[in-house]
Amino acid sequence: MQFFSTRDAARQVSASQAIVQGLSDEGGLFVPQSFPQVDVQAVCQLEYPAMAAAVLREYLTDYDPAFLARAAAETYGAAFAGKAGFLAPVEGDTWALELWHGPTCAFKDYALQLMPKLLVEAKRNLGRTEKTLILVATSGDTGKAALDGYHDVPGVEIAVFYPTGGTSEIQRLQMATQQGDNVAVYAVRGNFDDAQTGVKRVFADKQIAEQLAGRNIRLSSANSINWGRLVPQIVYYFAAYAQLLKAGKVAMGDPVDFCVPTGNFGDILAGYYAKRMGLPVGRLVCASNKNNVLTDFLNTGVYTARRAFFKTSSPSMDILVSSNLERLLYHVTGSDTEVAALMARLNQTGSYTVRPETLAAIQETFSCGYAEEDQVAGEIRARWQQDGYLCDTHTAVAFHVARQNKRAGVPMVVLSTASPFKFPRSVLAALGQRAPENDFEAMGLLEQATGRTAPASLAGLRGKAERFDAVIDPEQIAAVALGCQI
């Protein structure tokens, strides 16, 4: 399997090269040359680690299958407490795919617990001996998951950049208290898009690359712009379908709709790959918060990033430039020149418009909707009071949009992307309780109000020493990269 750049299909690399490099030299994202077809029934009979290995080996063809099997078994075992890809009934034929039972209590663990193994093996496959500097822009969950996955990995240094004031306090503490000799964390003045743009500029700067190369260092990414982040996320769509099969809720071939809360479009794009591999995915419903740039695009074909930015109770979705949409545009248009022109227009003017036939092709699979802040709170309250189901703010966005897009007779799986205890103040307030300023007090009150127990990895943050408190401007990200001490 070869991988092409979305902006220049003549640039072809192996899976190992795509994972080591992260981003193509001209700024494009790597996409697979084809969609491998799998025996869905056979895959759905596997346990999660074996299922992951089966999907991974279809794309990572230059990796030893035995290595992939070992890596998947190590990743999705004890760290997920037997709940990898856990599907919970909510009400009727609506289900929650709980993706927050990993070490950092967010869906990013599925990729970022595995990705360090993939990177180290990719370098071995390629005979590469240089050090790797990983730069990560995060709106909350990716940062901690990447830090947890890469800390103390030999030959790797990782720097994470998050928007100051743009995460929950729990998310911030998860990053600020991270242990490891090869990690660094910076708050960036501005929003997530400012941090992400700053990181992308570093990747595109040939002078920085040359200076680092002189020190035997190469840049890479752990954001979902890296193929190694995206491919593990395909697996849990198969896992959800498999559980519905085993429960007798669907017969093989019956469609299942998925509603995904997303800002950067990576998690929902993984569902598109699963569909193209043969999984009977019906509709993929894109759920946005008040920063509803994706809703507008999927309805009109016009992408406008230059708009008001809102800080919401679902901060991991507070994004205006959705990087992974570029991959979908490539798959739908089949044209690298068209995608390159659209991305250039976005960079220059802050917007672009796709052709009507492109929008129509996208709308064959994708539906959309968004939730205002009061609707998010109302959804948290309704799911708890009516169904006894406790969810976080991002999942609540998806539940709201899922109800708008529910098709009679078709099961709906809502991707639950983070533990409700990551956002205890917002969840507590939504339940009509007084929400104290302190997140840990709120966590305790949420436990009392619901009878649920906060994950130990979150409750244990209380009182931990903060190691990182630097605040920088986006323009200083380049200096951070050049100052790394691998």
Language model feature labels by segment:
Residues 1-486:
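PLP-dependent amino-acid enzyme catalytic core
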